Amino acid sequence: MIIEFASSSPAATEGMAAELSLWARAGQCILLSGELGSGKSTFARAFIRALAGGQQDFDIPSPTFSLLQSYDSTRVPVVHADLYRLRSATEVEELGLGDLLASNVLLIEWPEKLEGGISDEWLRISFSGTGQNRLLKLQAQESWVTYLERNAVINDFVTQSAFRNAARIFFEGDASARRYESLTADSKSVLLMDMPNRPDGPIVKNNRTYSAIAHLAEGMSAVVAINDYLFGLGYSTAEILDLDLGNGLALMESLGHDVFGKMTAEGRDMRKPMRAAIEVLADMAGRDWPRSVPLRGGSTYHLSEYDSDALSIEIDLLLSWYWPHVKRDSPSAAAAEEFAATWRGLLARVEVEEPVWTLRDFHSPNLLWMPERSGLRRVGLIDTQDCVLGHPAYDVVSLLQDARVDVEFEFADELFGYYCDLRTAAGPFDAKGFAQAFAILGAQRATKILGIFARLSKRDGKHLYLKHMPRVSRYLLRNLQHPDLAGLRMWYEKHFPSLWDGARK
C-alpha cells in the first residue's frame, strides 16, 4: 500500500506525524528515508512529542551523535535512531535494534544502512522536495495497511462534521478493541469513538463464539441504542452528536475528566460520588426495562438476558487462563466438572423474573463525576454497550468490588446499606435474598476477572493487569465467606490455597 501526502509546511508534516502517532504500538518500525534537511527529524520529533501528550517543553534531543535516544515516559516507549554516521552492518547490529523492538516503537532515520528487515510491522516514509514543500510517500506493510485505511475513513468522517478543523488527540480507553480520540474546536471538546464491527472469533462452545455466548457488543449499534435510551430517561450517558453507523464511528459528548478511578488515585473524597452512583443503581432497579429499544435509522436493538450460559462461559475463563497462569498446567476433568456443577447450583439462585438493565462494568473507569449537574445526572456513564438484562445486584458488585481501585470493606458495607435503605424506601425489598445474590455474583465476577487478567497478560502482553489480581482475590475470598457459598469455597481451598496468601499482597 502506497499513500502520498503533500506537505506545504513543517507544521503540516508535524500534523501528519501526530496523526500517525495515534496508531503507535510497541513492535512497530517506522523507517524515515530522505536527504539531509528533507524533514525526517521534524517528523520524528513531532511523532515523539505527540506520544508525550503534546508537551511543547518535552525534551527531544537529536540522536545524530548518540545514535539512539530512548523515551520511556511516552504513551508507548519510543527509540529514535539515526544511522547516518554508521559505516558497516556490524555497527548497526551492535545497536541491538532488534532487541529493542518488542517493547518500543522504533523510529529509524537513514534505514538504508540496515541489512535486512527488523520487523514485519513497518511503515516506510520517503521525504522529498525543497523549500517549504515536501512530498511524503508512505509505504505500509502488515497492520500499518489496516491502520492507514482506517485512518482515512476517520478523516473522511471528521471532515464532514462540525469538527473538521480539530486536531485529533489520543484519548485513553479500556482493555477492549475500541479506540477513542479527543477532538477540540472553538473551545468545545468531543470524543470520537472508533468501534468497527467486531470480526467473529473462534468457536468455543456449542458452535458459538465467546462473544456470542457472553452477549458482548459486536459493533456501534449497541452503543447508540443503549446510550440514546438511557439519555432519554435522564441518565448522563454521552449524547451522540454525529454518527456513521456503517463504519462504526461516532462523535460523542465529552463528560469531562473527573473519572472515578482517577479521582480515587488522586486521593480525592469519594463519598459523594459513590453515594450518587448508588442512587443511580437504586433508581435503575426500580424501573421496568424494555427488552428492545429503537435504533437510529428505523430499526430495533434487542437486549440479551444475562443468562446462565453467559455467566458460565465467563466463569470458564478461570479454568482456561487463570489455572495455567498459576499452576502451569490444565485442570483435570474431575476438577472442571466439580467446578461447573457447583456453579450450576449457585447460578440457579440468581435467576430473576423481572431483570433490570445491567451495564456489567459499572465501575471506576466508566463513571464520571459531574457535580455541576443535579440528582442522578451527576454521574456520567460510559462503556454501556454490553448492557444486558440481569440481576440488579451485579452492577452493585461492579461498583463496590472494583477491580481497578481499592474500595475499603467498611466503606463498601456502608454503601451497600445505603443501597438497601433506598430500595426498602421505594417498596418491597428482599434484603436477605439480595445479599445472597450479591455474594454469588461477586464471586462470579471475581472469578471471571481473574481469568480475564491472566488472559490479557498471556495472550495480549498486557502484564500491568496482573497487579490487580490480589485485590480481586480479596473480593473473591470475602464473597466466599457467605454460608451459601461453602461448597465453592471448599473447591477454591482445594485447588487454589495460594489465593489466601496472594490476597494479602
Residue spans for each PLM region:
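An alpha-helical support segment within catalytic cores of ATP-dependent transferases
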Residues: W289-S304, D309-A310, E314-T358, P371-R373, ...
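Active-site activation/catalytic loop segments of kinase-like enzymes and analogous catalytic loops
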Residues: L317-V326, P392-P428, A443-R459, V472-L480
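Conserved lysine of the Walker
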Residues: K40
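ATP/Mg2+ or Mg2+-diphosphate-binding catalytic cores
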Residues: G451-K505
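Active-site acidic catalytic loop and adjacent metal/ATP-binding pocket
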Residues: A177-T184, L191-L192, M284, R344-V396, ...
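Short phosphate-coordinating micro-motif centered on Lys-Gly-acidic
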Residues: I3, G98-I154
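ATP-binding pocket architecture of kinase catalytic cores
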Residues: S182-I313, L317, P324, E351-V352
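ATP-binding glycine-rich phosphate-binding loop
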Residues: S161-A185, E218
